[in-house]
Swiss-Prot record:
This is V-type proton ATPase catalytic subunit A. V-ATPase is a heteromultimeric enzyme made up of two complexes: the ATP-hydrolytic V1 complex and the proton translocation V0 complex. The V1 complex consists of three catalytic AB heterodimers that form a heterohexamer, three peripheral stalks each consisting of EG heterodimers, one central rotor including subunits D and F, and the regulatory subunits C and H. The proton translocation complex V0 consists of the proton transport subunit a, a ring of proteolipid subunits c9c'', rotary subunit d, subunits e and f, and the accessory subunits VhaAC45 and ATP6AP2. It comes from Anopheles gambiae (African malaria mosquito). ATP hydrolysis occurs at the interface between the nucleotide-binding domains of subunits A and B. ATP hydrolysis triggers a conformational change in the subunits D and F, which induces a shift of subunit d. The c-ring is subsequently rotated and results in a continuous proton translocation across the membrane. GO terms for cellular component: proton-transporting V-type ATPase, V1 domain. Catalytic subunit of the V1 complex of vacuolar(H+)-ATPase (V-ATPase), a multisubunit enzyme composed of a peripheral complex (V1) that hydrolyzes ATP and a membrane integral complex (V0) that translocates protons. V-ATPase is responsible for acidifying and maintaining the pH of intracellular compartments and in some cell types, is targeted to the plasma membrane, where it is responsible for acidifying the extracellular environment. ATP binds at G247, A248, F249, G250, C251, G252, K253, T254. Its EC number is 7.1.2.2. Keywords: ATP-binding, Hydrogen ion transport, Ion transport, Nucleotide-binding, Translocase, Transport. InterPro entries: ATP-synt_VA_C, ATP-synth_a_Xtn, ATP_synth_asu-like_sf, ATPase_a/bsu_AS, ATPase_F1/V1/A1_a/bsu_N, ATPase_F1/V1/A1_a/bsu_N_sf, ATPase_F1/V1/A1_a/bsu_nucl-bd, ATPase_F1/V1_b/a_C. It holds the Pfam family ATP-synt_ab_N.
Length: 614
């Protein structure tokens, strides 16, 4: 019996399969038994990157992330045995990747061409650049588990890159590198567990379709301040929240997501341009390095806290699907360091269209509008990776990932499957309105259809810091809603026949719309509105409304009636000051001066109404 061959002696099945059929980005290969779902493969003599998305018998269906022209039947398909993964380590911030994390700048320098050659094999993070590494209080002999911080790399002046033990590793430290300069390939930590020694470099590799583990999810209770008045006051989002911005073409989705990445109170921004125009990504590349943010009195370029994943509309379709996962995995990595990360996905509709195209090539059953039946599940699995969490390992830290997804429904129709599936998942809906955009009212957020489900979660924050804010916001919504109802009557019978209080409502609503909700992203004073300024402006506008109504209601029965016309004629100056509150520049004037000016205006208003009533 002993001379019989064992299976283990035989050569394992070969690492090669062969191309059987090609249909656009979808390639079928034979002799692929033993391969796994979502395994990375190299197709053809160019070694194009692909991923297995279906297995039947020994046939595998592969979606290829590059142009497949020139692939012929019988070409070899090399199995790598690894899933599609991203490299996580120093060097991510400030760089621009394509959908499968190939560094576009390095490729450009290497080939000196504006095109990405086929099957190019470039390391995602530079292997030659050295980073200055400082160990934290971890010594040889100390025990360490997944997620523990063991060192810091000052990636740039804005982002401290904290090095973590990979989530599934554990053991006793045998060696930790002293402070000094190392590349991402140098071993800086060795651990021993059960007699096995593991070596770690600054680089971690993580599969993109798998969420990174956390200790627990926490309730989100801190607002994501965007610097846009209409969003911060009426429809706030939280750090760790999910938001959708649906809107037709030309409504300003991209401007909103760019201003979020410029001015929001996040530590790290990941901007995924997914199937949108290439010019928008180049605009980001051109604008961001010039924009600065002030941290502890030092001005820094915003590009230092931003990573870009560019997958424009002329790049291969299949890579669009990967780009969203690449972006969210990069975000989760920085979240695990204890940062608040915002991820902008512009736009998830193009991602859904990529799913639809691949699904059509696979001859799957189409559902609504030809999208695959699993569209909702895929969207949910992406959005649910957002949230505020307690990170793995020591020291204890909290991080969050907020996702802002732009949706471009065809013809601005919000009943489109992608929009309706997204609205069933996200908690905040900033609906953009074509009519407002045509009236040049930007940001063109329709205050009647938009909503936020985080109001209750944020009440504690407002009570602690801005106690008068919540009742004012409720009143603003009431005024805007009333104005909508009155506008129909006005169109029928004209303004003159309205009650005096209704005239006040109309005028204050006009003031709110023109000078509070509207905001010019391209002006120095208004491109960013800090929250104290938002609250100050609201306080004065609502104060004016309350005082005017009070004056009209108390004198309605008496001899000298105060009507809206009387108020308007005698308070021209105050109305002018109310509508020019937005011109106060937070950078030049500073917080104390703006607050003092707003308080002064409030006192002037009270005095003016006292004089009027006397």
């Amino acid at each position: 019996m002993s001379n019989l061959k064992k299976i283990s002696d035989e050569d394992r099945e070969s690492k090669f399969g062969y191309v059987f059929a090609v249909s656009g980005p979808v390639v079928t290969a034979e002799r692929m038994s033993g391969s796994a779902m979502y395994e990375l493969v190299r197709v053809g003599y160019y070694e194009l990157v692909g991923e297995i998305i279906r297995l039947e018998g020994d046939m595998a269906t592969i979606q290829v992330y590059e142009e497949t022209s020139g692939v012929t039947v019988g070409d070899p398909v090399l199995r790598t045995g690894k899933p599609l993964s991203v490299e996580l380590g120093p060097g991510i911030m400030g760089s621009i990747f394509d959908g499968i994390q190939r560094p576009l700048k390095d490729i450009n320098e290497m080939t000196s061409s504006i095109y990405i050659p086929k099957g190019i094999n470039v390391p995602c993070l530079s292997r030659t650049q050295s980073w200055s590494f400082n160990p934290l209080n971890v010594k040889a002999g100390s025990h360490i588990t997944g997620g523990d911080l063991y060192g810091i790399v000052h990636e740039n002046t804005l982002v401290k890159h904290k090095l973590m033990v990979p989530p599934r590793a554990k053991g006793t430290v045998k060696y930790i590198a002293p402070s000094g300069n190392y590349t991402v390939d140098d071993v800086i930590l060795e651990t021993e567990f059960d007699g096995e020694i593991s070596k770690f470099t600054m680089l971690q590799v993580w599969p993109v379709r798998q969420p990174r583990p956390v200790t627990e999810k926490l309730p989100a209770n801190h607002p994501l301040l965007t610097g846009q008045r209409v969003l911060d006051s009426l429809f706030p989002c939280v750090q760790g929240g999910t938001t959708a911005i649906p809107g037709a073409f030309g409504c300003g989705k991209t401007v909103i997501s760019q201003s979020l990445s410029k001015y929001s109170n996040s530590d790290v921004i990941v901007y995924v341009g997914c199937g949108e125009r290439g010019n928008e990504m180049s605009e980001v590349l051109r604008d961001f390095p010039e924009l600065s943010v002030e941290i502890d009195g030092v001005t820094e370029s915003i590009m230092k806290r931003t990573a870009l994943v560019a997958n424009t509309s002329n790049m291969p379709v299949a890579a669009r699907e990967a780009s969203i996962y690449t972006g969210i995995t990069l975000s989760e990595y920085f979240r695990d360091m204890g940062y608040n990360v915002s991820m902008m996905a512009d736009s998830t509709s193009r991602w859904a269209e990529a799913l639809r195209e691949i699904s059509g090539r696979l001859a799957e059953m189409p559902a609504d509008s030809g999208y695959p039946a699993y569209l909702g599940a895929r969207l949910a699995s992406f959005y649910e990776r957002a949230g505020r969490v307690k990170c793995l390992g020591n020291p204890e830290r909290e991080g969050s990932v907020s996702i802002v997804g732009a949706v471009s429904p065809p013809g601005g129709d919000f009943s489109d499957p992608v929009t309706s599936a997204t609205l069933g998942i996200v908690q905040v809906f900033w609906g953009l309105d074509k009519k407002l955009a045509q009236r040049k009212h930007f940001p063109s957020i329709n205050w009647l259809i938009s909503y936020s489900k985080y109001m209750r979660a944020l009440e504690d924050f407002y009570d602690k810091n801005f106690p008068e804010f919540v009742p004012m916001r409720t009143k603003v919504k009431e005024i805007l809603q009333e104005e909508e109802d009155l506008s129909e009557i006005v169109q029928l019978v004209g303004k003159a026949s309205l009650a005096e209080t209704d005239k006040i409502t109309l005028e204050v609503a006009k003031l709110l719309k023109d000078d509070f909700l509207q905001q010019n992203s391209y002006s120095a004073y208004d491109r960013f509105c800090p929250f104290y300024k938002t609250v100050g402006m609201l306080k004065n506008m609502i104060g004016f409304y309350d005082m005017a109504r009070h004056a009209v209601e108390t004198t309605a029965q008496s001899e000298n009636k105060i009507t809206w016309n009387v108020i308007r004629d005698s308070m021209g100056q105050i109305l002018y000051q109310l509508s020019s509150m937005k011109f106060k520049d937070p950078v030049k004037d500073g917080e104390p001066k703006i607050k003092a000016d707003f308080d002064q205006l409030y006192e002037d208003m009270q005095q003016a109404f006292r004089n009027l009533e006397d």
